[in-house]
Amino acid sequence: MLYPSIDLLMQKVDSKYKLVTVAAKRARQLQENEELTIKNPVSKKFVGQALEEIAADHIELVEEK
């Protein structure tokens, strides 16, 4: 079973494409030594940690126009 589940993540983000984009951008920030906002992440990979942050509502999604 994957954590966090896609169902939980889709409740936080209205589009799976936006979810992928946000997770990738956040993973890139984490790779560049940005501080992690959750304690004791389940995943050891940056993308997994980014998804955990999204699931925990630690990432605020802002629409750019």
UniProtKB/Swiss-Prot annotation:
Q: Which GO terms describe its cellular component?
A: DNA-directed RNA polymerase complex
UniProt keyword Transferase present: yes
Q: What is its EC number?
A: 2.7.7.6
Any one of the GO BP annotations: DNA-templated transcription
Q: Which Gene3D superfamilies match?
A: 3.90.940.10
The record's section on InterPro entries has: DNA-dir_RNA_pol_omega, Pol_omega/Rpo6/RPB6, RPB6/omega-like_sf
* Annotated Pfam families: RNA_pol_Rpb6
Q: Does the keyword Transferase apply?
A: yes
**MF (Gene Ontology):** DNA binding; DNA-directed RNA polymerase activity
| Catalysed transformations (reactions) | RNA(n) + a ribonucleoside 5'-triphosphate = RNA(n+1) + diphosphate
| Keywords noted in UniProt | DNA-directed RNA polymerase, Nucleotidyltransferase, Transcription, Transferase
Question: Which HAMAP family does this UniProt record tie to the protein?
Answer: RNApol_bact_RpoZ (MF_00366)
Q: What does this protein do?
A: Promotes RNA polymerase assembly. Latches the N- and C-terminal regions of the beta' subunit thereby facilitating its interaction with the beta and alpha subunits.
Q: Which family does it belong to?
A: Belongs to the RNA polymerase subunit omega family.
| NCBIfam families documented for this protein | rpoZ
How this chain assembles, per its entry, is: The RNAP catalytic core consists of 2 alpha, 1 beta, 1 beta' and 1 omega subunit. When a sigma factor is associated with the core the holoenzyme is formed, which can initiate transcription.
| Protein name stated in the entry | DNA-directed RNA polymerase subunit omega
What is the species of this protein? Geobacillus sp. (strain WCH70)
